[in-house]
Amino acid sequence: DSMTVDELLAKWFKEYAEPQLKPQTVSDYKRLVPRISAAVGHIKLSKLRPGHLMQFYTQLQQPGVRMDGKYKVTASFIKKFPKGKRKALVAAAGVAERTAARIWAGESTSLHTAKKLAEAANVAFSKAFVNTSKDEKLSGNSARHYHRLLSSVFNTAVRWQLMAENPCARVDPPKVEAADVQYLDEQGIARLLAALPDAPTQYSVIVQLALFTGCRRGELCGLRWSDIDLPAGVLAVNRTLTSIPGQGLLFSTPKTKKSRRVIKLDENAVQLLKDYQQWQLRERLRIGSKWVRTVEIMGKTVDNDLLFTKWDGRPIDPAGLTSWFPRFLRQHDLPPVRFHSLRHSNAALLIAAHVPVTTVAGRLGHAQVSTTTNIYAGFIRSSDAKAADALGEAFSRILHEGAG
């Protein structure tokens, strides 16, 4: 009776989540805890009511609630730390020099990075950085993540006989608005491909492979040459690479069972990989003994045949790819989309080509076809309208020829 929500959360993570769930899932869930703790963490389980959760969900969707917004350095902070003093500050904060250079140049940064710099400088955060996204609120989908986590925690508590029932069962989850899916149209893809010769070779190839296959970022970073049969033109998705705070880079199984899949490659993708394989072999010879010969993948030490690596063969950090991509787009005056938008672009091309939605779902690794239809409903309607027009033209020809 005396256990609080905070105490239950700690118990749930230690005894259920960490032993049974994927590290990435646990990490994602832990990011939700601060808001939950602030809102209902102090409440005893015996006193928790649906109304507490309803109030929490309402708060989540209020303007200004986002903690992951963009932060810019203030003029007073820049004045306090002229160029001669910045290097020591950046080192003390543990911030990468490239990241710091972008911050001093006026680019926005994350709350985490901004806090590290302010703390290292011993300056009040509000004096060092300003939130440039104060009016942003959590999307319905983001707010629903809190409902899913709490529901899972309370279901477990019921099984453990710590609660009589799950209060989430009596609360409607936050509404999810239909989000606009960001993607590149054919012209946008053509412009991106034309700019890629200016990109680092590995990033150029990974962007093209994302467009050709629709694979997720972590799936691409986790690829090995043993996953690819170039003569047959197929690629197998067998693992994903993720960056876990406090643990570093970890290989794990794909997102869902359906995410483990085999994707047929077209001639362009096959040739791209053949050329890239030769480039990588030349790089390995150039690096020589500094090349990392083995890597640990899901508890096993194996020969290093990773497709995408750092200069010395170590696994590439997916987060680095994510931060590089928008900068590259800005430098080449390209539409400001996310790296994940390449996956959406692949789906849009398939749907426009009238590929069956079941095939699209299979290539993307969606657990259910409904996931595909929900995400790409707009694309499907547009494609269906074009199909109806084509059918109408066909019948018009038939009727005209029949009348003739």
Show where each model-derived region lies.
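Short, polar N-cap/turn motifs at the start of nucleic acid-interacting alpha helices
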Residues: V95-E97, D227-V234, P336, V355-I375
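Basic, Lys/Arg- and aromatic-enriched nucleic-acid-binding interface segment
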Residues: R66-Y71, S76, L111-K115, K134-R148, ...
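Catalytic-site neighborhood detector that most strongly recognizes the C-terminal catalytic loop/helix
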Residues: G106-S108, K175, L241-S243, L364-A390
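C-terminal secondary-structure termini that scaffold catalytic or DNA-interacting sites
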Residues: Q62, A194, A232, S243-A269, ...
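Short, Lys/Arg-enriched alpha-helical recognition elements, typified by the DNA-recognition helix
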Residues: D1-G106, S110-V158, R170-P173, G188-I189, ...
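Residues in the helix-turn-helix
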Residues: T25, T99, S142, P167, ...
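The alpha-helix within a helix-turn-helix
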Residues: V90, A118, A210, C221, ...
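Short, basic (Lys/Arg/His-rich) helix/loop patches that form interaction surfaces
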Residues: A91-A93, E136, A194-S204, T213, ...
